[in-house]
Amino acid sequence: MLRIAVQSKGRLFEETMALLQEADIKISTSKRILLVQSSNFPIEVLFLRDDDIPQSVAGGVADLGIVGENEFVERKEDAEVIKRLGFSKCRLSLAIPKDVDYPGLSWFEGRKIATSYPGILKDFMDRNGIHSDIHVITGSVEIAPGISLADAIFDIVSSGSTLVSNSLKEVEVVMKSEALLIGNKNMSEEKKEILNELLFRIEAVKAAEDKKYVLMNAPTERLKEIIEVLPGMKSPTVMPLAQEGWSSVHTVLDEKRFWEIIGKLKALGAEGILVLPIEKMIL
């Protein structure tokens, strides 16, 4: 049985639960219980505060954890990064009052900066030879300049709307963060086998993200040109149709290039284009 530590609420919690659900790992979250066992996979989920997850994994309380990179780097716990998960993306940035002219990092020399991430901020300032007064607070960091508690803030930024609503502007991006799957360095071989099965499922789900399964009818005489346009996984599937001179072509397209490629296919005579979502993809 593997124990995985997960944030107990918030965006990271929601996206983690969605990932486990897509991997067909059933976890009941209907009751506010700290430890919940999956009904169909040898895993149990321990719900914790995000800043407690790195320590719980490093100390062996949990075998795995899904945590924001920002918290993992800040805590400096001795755990292994197993996989970058690509969701709950944000950045840690320095922000100052919007009406202040910003000449560069030298502006922060001797200034008071409010933050919940003093370790990351100090490392950044030390690398750049800046001496600032780091003021540690938890929660509502963005109000600090407005109540004269600090000259600037160092905090998580997602959309930037919180900064705008507090009359602040982002001036330096210090690090970019996303969800990480971290693991204890001393897992047993039995637990590693379960981890490998978990990773197999996660990778199948992640591989299918932003991908579409596309079927189309294509004139056989243009097949070579059509296949050259398609950036399929290996080679598209081509099957002759009952109507002479036509073939059915099946492939997988990246959603980011979908409309660009579909336009080229139509110009080459493709018809009856059917687009389907992909839940999982085994590579």
Swiss-Prot record:
The subcellular location is: Cytoplasm
Family matches, as InterPro entries: ATP-PRT_HisG_long (IPR020621), ATP_PRibTrfase_cat (IPR013820), ATP_PRibTrfase_HisG (IPR001348), HisG_C (IPR013115), N-reg_PII-like_a/b (IPR011322), N-reg_PII/ATP_PRibTrfase_C (IPR015867)
Any one GO CC term of this protein is:
cytoplasm
Q: Which SUPFAM superfamilies match?
A: GlnB-like, Periplasmic binding protein-like II
What EC class is this?
Answer: transferase
Give the reaction(s) catalysed.
1-(5-phospho-beta-D-ribosyl)-ATP + diphosphate = 5-phospho-alpha-D-ribose 1-diphosphate + ATP
Q: How is its activity regulated?
A: Feedback inhibited by histidine.
Q: Which family does the UniProt entry place this protein in?
A: Belongs to the ATP phosphoribosyltransferase family. Long subfamily.
Protein name, entry field: ATP phosphoribosyltransferase
- Organism whose genome encodes this protein: Phocaeicola vulgatus (strain ATCC 8482 / DSM 1447 / JCM 5826 / CCUG 4940 / NBRC 14291 / NCTC 11154) (Bacteroides vulgatus)
